[in-house]
Swiss-Prot record:
Catalytic activity, as annotated: Endonucleolytic cleavage to 5'-phosphomonoester
Keywords for this protein: Cytoplasm, Endonuclease, Hydrolase, Manganese, Metal-binding, Nuclease
Organism superkingdom: Bacteria
NCBIfam families the record matches: PRK00015.1-1, PRK00015.1-3
Cofactor(s) required for function per UniProt: Mn(2+); Mg(2+)
SUPFAM superfamilies per UniProt: Ribonuclease H-like
Similarity comment: Belongs to the RNase HII family.
Protein name per the record: Ribonuclease HII
GO biological process: DNA replication, removal of RNA primer; mismatch repair
Uppermost EC category: hydrolase
Cited function: Endonuclease that specifically degrades the RNA of RNA-DNA hybrids.
C-alpha cells in the first residue's frame, strides 16, 4: 500500500537535498495533494539554501580575520542619528566563530516583528555585548557625528571580553584596537548586523519609556523621527528635555546657537 499524503509530507519535511531520490519518486505520484506538498517543500529548501548562502556571504569580513588568527571580532553599529528626539544608541557585539543566525541582517531590513526573536538569539550566542548611549544634550554640545563616536567607544569599553579587531559601520574610531571601516557594514557583516539589531531594539524600548513621560509626541511609534504627529506636537506643546536643539525645525524654534 502506498504512503498517505500525510506520511509523504512528513518525509518531505526531513529532506534538505533537492536531488534526494524521494523527490523523483513522489513526482510520479499524480495526487494533487502530493504535487502541492512537493512544490511547497522545494520552495522551502530553495529559500533555506538562499538564506544559508546569504549568511555565509555576511561572514566574508570575519573569515578574512579568522585567517589571520584573529578570533575576537566586535561588530559595531549605531541607531538614532536622524531623529529629532532621544539618544543615539550604539552596540558592540562579539559573536563566536562562524556564527550564523537565521534572519540576521541590517535592522532596517528586518521586519520589526522579528527584532526581539533575533535579539534573543544574539544574546544567547554572543560572547559579549556592549551598549553605548549618548543623550540629546551631548549631541547638541558636540554634534551627532562626534556623539556617535563617543557612544561607540562606550559600547566597546563595556564589552566583558576585549576584542582583537573592530568591524565598524562607516566609521573610524580613535581607539587603540585594530579596526576596519565597512560602508553599509550592517548589511555586509554578521557582527555589525548583530550590533544593529541590539542597538535598534535598545533604542526602541527607550523611546517607548519616553512616550510614557511625554505621551503627546507619539514617541512609541515615531522613535523620535519628525513625523507629522510629532511636528504637530512640537508646535502645540514645545520641546522636551530629550529633543535635540541643534536639529531643525527645533533649532529655529528655540534660536539655538551651535
Amino acid at each position: 500500500m502506498g504512503q498517505t499524503i500525510k506520511e509523504i509530507k512528513a518525509t518531505l519535511a526531513k529532506l534538505t537535498d533537492l536531488s534526494a531520490k524521494e523527490f523523483l519518486e513522489y513526482e510520479a505520484d499524480e495526487r494533487a495533494g502530493v504535487q502541492a506538498a512537493l512544490k511547497s517543500r522545494k520552495k522551502q529548501i530553495l529559500a533555506e539554501l538562499a538564506e544559508e548562502a546569504r549568511l555565509e556571504q555576511m561572514l566574508e569580513f570575519e573569515k578574512e580575520l579568522y585567517g589571520q588568527e584573529i578570533q575576537l571580532i566586535a561588530g559595531i553599529d549605531e541607531v538614532g542619528r536622524g531623529p529629532l528626539a532621544g539618544p543615539v544608541v550604539t552596540a558592540a557585539v562579539i559573536l563566536p566563530k562562524n556564527c550564523k543566525i537565521r534572519g540576521l541582517n541590517d535592522s532596517k531590513k528586518v521586519p520589526k516583528s522579528k527584532h526581539h526573536a533575533i535579539l534573543s538569539e544574539i544574546q544567547e550566542k554572543a560572547l559579549a555585548i556592549g551598549i553605548g548611549i549618548v543623550d540629546a544634550e551631548k549631541i547638541d554640545e558636540v554634534n551627532i557625528y562626534e556623539a556617535t563616536k563617543i557612544a561607540m567607544i562606550q559600547a566597546v569599553s563595556k564589552l566583558s571580553v576585549k576584542p582583537e579587531h573592530l568591524l565598524i559601520d562607516a566609521m573610524v574610531l580613535d581607539f587603540p584596537i585594530a579596526q576596519t571601516k565597512i560602508i553599509h557594514g550592517d548589511a555586509r557583516s554578521a557582527s555589525i548586523a548583530a550590533a544593529s539589531i541590539v542597538a535598534k531594539v535598545t533604542r526602541d524600548e527607550m523611546m517607548k519609556e519616553f512616550a510614557l513621560e511625554f505621551p503627546e509626541y507619539d514617541f512609541e511609534h515615531n522613535a523620535g523621527y519628525g513625523t507629522a504627529k510629532h511636528l504637530e506636537a512640537l508646535t502645540k506643546y514645545g520641546i522636551t528635555r530629550i529633543h535635540r536643539k541643534s536639529y531643525e525645525p527645533i533649532k529655529t524654534m528655540v534660536n539655538f546657537k551651535s
